[in-house]
Amino acid sequence: GSSPCRSVIMTAKAVGVELNKKLLNLQAGEHLKPEFLKINPQHTIPTLVDNGFALWESRAIQVYLVEKYGKTDSLYPKCPKKRAVINQRLYFDMGTLYQSFANYYYPQVFAKAPADPEAFKKIESAFEFLNTFLEGQEYAAGDSLTVADIALVASVSTFEVAGFEISKYANVNKWYENAKKVTPGWSENWAGCLEFKKFF
């Protein structure tokens, strides 16, 4: 149900790759078993193994899947400027948007800590940035769906099930409603979100 796993599932769907998914029980420490550490010493999920080649970090996996299996480069164009904007959005998603989710919600969910209002402000600030990026834009980076949209829709949908009010951000809300319709694998993403919702 995690956002990074769902972004990989949607990207695989977009390029027509059938994933052989293996569920790891993190609470039971399955990601710390020697056989998994051999594949990924950083023991993070998702981890992709493609004919013996192991890769982790969801956004790196997304780019790899598109570069290796995409019929066209539309999800991650070869043009340096287009690609730079996509990369910026991916890093924004990882370092600002999704990070704000983790900083605010994870201590509450996993450590039963009280809500931190300062961390909540960081979420609002991240959404304000995203709202600005999306001004007059149908897509997050350029004029068509890219891996940036897929990563961001995985994150934004996670905020939705956590109860964050996305509708307060008009540009984000408009983009998100469209992304639900045009992102391959959306229904599987939403099913994963609903799994994740049990934590909130």
From Swiss-Prot:
CDD domains: GST_C_Delta_Epsilon (cd03177), GST_N_Delta_Epsilon (cd03045). It comes from Drosophila mauritiana. This is Glutathione S-transferase 1-1. Conjugation of reduced glutathione to a wide number of exogenous and endogenous hydrophobic electrophiles. Has DDT dehydrochlorinase activity. Residues 79-200 form the GST C-terminal domain. The gene is GstD1. GO terms for biological process: glutathione metabolic process. Residues 1-73 form the GST N-terminal domain. InterPro entries: Glutathione-S-Trfase_C-like, Glutathione-S-Trfase_C_sf, Glutathione_S-Trfase_N, GST_C, Thioredoxin-like_sf. The lineage of its organism: Eukaryota, Metazoa, Ecdysozoa, Arthropoda, Hexapoda. Belongs to the GST superfamily. Theta family. Glutathione binds at S2, H43, T44, I45, E57, S58, R59. It catalyses: RX + glutathione = an S-substituted glutathione + a halide anion + H(+); 1,1,1-trichloro-2,2-bis(4-chlorophenyl)ethane = 1,1-dichloro-2,2-bis(4-chlorophenyl)ethylene + chloride + H(+). It holds the Pfam family GST_C. Its EC number is 2.5.1.18, 4.5.1.1. GO terms for molecular function: DDT-dehydrochlorinase activity; glutathione transferase activity. It comes from the Eukaryota. Homodimer. Keywords: Lyase, Transferase.
